[in-house]
Amino acid sequence: IENQELLRRALSRSPKCRLILSAHDFHGPFEDITALHRRILTVCPSAIPKLVYTAKHINDCFEAFDLLHRTSGERIVFCMGESGVISRMLAGKLGSFLTFASIDDESATAPGQLTIRKFKELYRGDSVNSEMSLFGVIADPVAHSLSPAIHNACFADAKMNSLYLPLLVKGGSAGFDSFMRNIIRRKWLEFKGLSVTIPHKEDALKFVKANGGRVEPLAEKIGAANTLLITEHGGLHAFNTDYASALDAITAGMGISRADLCDLSVAVVGAGGVARAIVAALSDAGAKIIIYNRTIEKAQRLAAEFGCDWAGPDELPSL
């Protein structure tokens, strides 16, 4: 930008040449991304602005999304870092002129850059468009999750114009609440549903209740939700599918019926969201449950809630 006259002379000699004017911040979001975008176009109206910054939290991505949503023309806007990965995946939906991918993991030129194969095959890069509905799994960590691979393969097979994203939401309940508010107030992102896993299942239930959403009875009983439905008008419905899944997995693995769980002695290790669903399911089936957890207080609270026994991890029988 400091060499405006030099740029003008160079472009005048090559009228078919387009200029990309870039600004990067490797430390965090720009102080004023809108003003920076305007400044680039003021200096060189024919240029393609490229604005790239590091997202320290997934919530930092929304500044980039907002700029793409409220501006037109050719521009390149996305975030670097593991928290900014979804901004690369959504380039096609939000109208970014281009995004970047690497040949392989070793060839990545910036943190958070996807490989070409992962971008095209796992995240349907060639099919992403402005009308696409969005889904995703909220977790911390999330990179290990198979949910994007499973759901995106199903979407492609069913010819559904949908994309399932890995949503790394750090910062406990505060980070979760902020993320949910960000997507709900931006209906144009078209988020339709979310899977929720560790450590946010209890956060999900609390958020839906606090914001006037509908909670299915099973999720209310368990005190955790692993599935959120977002209605057309931004309403929320919370569900818990862990209860039925746990019973099906346990009975199938043991080759027994649900009725056979009655009076069966069962050790449950953990006292988080999944453990709550398993304890609720086994309790309803009549099993005799002992909850083992490193944090004794959490084991005590869960045991008291469902009428179970509890113990510390040092008392867990060797398996």
Question: For each predicted feature, which ranges?
Answer:
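Residues at the starts of beta-strands that form the adenosine-phosphate
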Residues: 18, 74, 265, 287-290
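Glycine-rich adenosine-cofactor-binding loop
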Residues: 79, 134-142, 238-243, 250, ...
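Short, solvent-exposed amphipathic alpha-helices that sit
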Residues: 36, 146-155, 273, 277, ...
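Catalytic alpha/beta core domains of metabolic enzymes, predominantly
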Residues: 2-133
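Phosphate/diphosphate ligand-binding glycine-rich loop within oxidoreductases
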Residues: 132-256
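NAD(P)-binding Rossmann-fold cofactor-contacting core
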Residues: 285-306
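Short acidic low-complexity segments
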Residues: 306-319
